[in-house]
From Swiss-Prot:
Signal peptide region: 1-31
Notes on the domains: The FZ domain is involved in binding with Wnt ligands.
Cellular component annotations (GO), alphabetically ordered: extracellular space
Pfam families (alphabetical): Fz, NTR
GO biological processes: canonical Wnt signaling pathway; cell differentiation; non-canonical Wnt signaling pathway
Top-rank taxon, per record: Eukaryota
Bilayer-crossing regions: none
Main location: secreted
Location of the FZ domain: 53-169
Species name: Gallus gallus (Chicken)
Protein name, entry field: Secreted frizzled-related protein 1
């Protein structure tokens, strides 16, 4: 991704989170003052609190938990704050958020998500601040809508605390938590030519096609892509007999640039998902067999190591 944050930037942001959290905990007393028989929440998101059937434990964040491995701390609590009791379940659920993290829609995205998926080890659960949730939601939901998704119910911001002990990056009005500037590229077109990133998109998409494009036009705020030739790499919900009639939409993309579409004389790798009767483009790459990273992807495409993505966005 051309505008992706560096790992150092993410770690710096996470350090700010931990410092803010430390100050907050000092304000209400040391962790040893809390007497919890089991891992219980009383912070409002889950009225009446909750108990887990298993005692909580502090475990290392594994390298293949890609959403949170670079968050800035090394250990997390299981069960987490989304009721995932095993690491396998955490990885399964968290994997669907990695493409959004790579879109860099807000610098607090990783901190917010990992405070829930991979909470830092403390004597009691601490949730993200409501304003952090709102800031991430307001910046990232417009990006999600390009892919046909909306902010999910499981992350409704009004369930998180406003002014109690909570995870924060800095003050709500700080300029550094605003959405990074400098890109107006349609999010599905803002892709890094790295084999791992292409595989992530393939796994997160319902279908994938090699195609040439006949025409691109604007209609009702979308870019409409009319294929000339197409070959299915992954059909998903598309029936083979319907391939000839397939039309793709770059949702909300009428007025944002998609540089891959500036020259239609190439073959393209196009991925997407079906929403009702529409087929939305979720990623586009020039089909470039001379590119080293694309060649790596082609070796992996026959048997990609894909998790089964949960329907967390519905």
């Amino acid at each position: 991704m051309g505008v992706g944050r560096s790992e150092g930037g993410r770690r710096g942001a996470a350090l700010g989170v931990l410092l803010a959290l430390g100050v907050a905990l000092l304000a209400v007393g040391s962790a040893s003052e809390y007497d919890y028989v089991s891992y219980q929440s009383d912070l409002g998101p889950y009225p009446g609190g909750r108990f887990y059937t298993k005692p909580h434990q502090c475990v290392a964040i594994p390298a293949d938990l890609r959403l949170c491995h670079s968050v800035g701390y090394d250990k997390m609590v299981l069960p987490n704050l989304l009721d995932h009791e095993t690491m396998a379940e955490v990885k399964h659920q968290a994997s669907s958020w990695v493409p959004l993290l790579n879109k860099n829609c807000h610098m607090g995205t990783q901190v917010f998500l990992c405070s829930l998926f991979a909470p830092v080890c403390l004597d009691r659960p601490v949730y993200p601040c409501r304003w952090l949730c709102e800031a991430v939601r307001d910046s990232c939901e417009p990006v999600m809508q390009f892919f046909g998704f909306f902010w999910p119910e499981m992350l409704k911001c009004d369930q998180f605390p406003q002014d109690y002990v909570c995870i924060a990056m800095t003050t709500p009005n700080a300029t550094e938590v605003s959405r990074p500037k400098g890109t107006t590229v349609c999010p599905p077109c803002d892709n890094e030519m790295k084999s791992e990133a292409i595989v992530e998109h393939l796994c997160a998409s319902e279908f994938a096609l090699k195609m040439t494009i006949k025409e691109v036009k604007k209609e009702n705020g979308d870019k409409v892509i009319i294929p000339r030739k197409r070959k299915a790499l992954k059909l998903g919900p598309i029936r083979k007999k319907n391939l000839k009639k397939l039309v793709l939409l770059l949702k909300n993309g009428a007025d944002c640039p998609c540089h891959q579409l500036d020259n239609l004389g190439h073959h393209f790798l196009i991925m997407g998902r079906q929403v009702k009767t529409q087929h939305l483009l979720t990623a586009i790459y020039k089909w470039d067999k001379k590119n080293k990273e694309f060649k790596k992807f082609m070796k992996k495409v026959k048997a990609p190591d894909c998790p089964t993505f949960p329907s967390v966005f519905k």
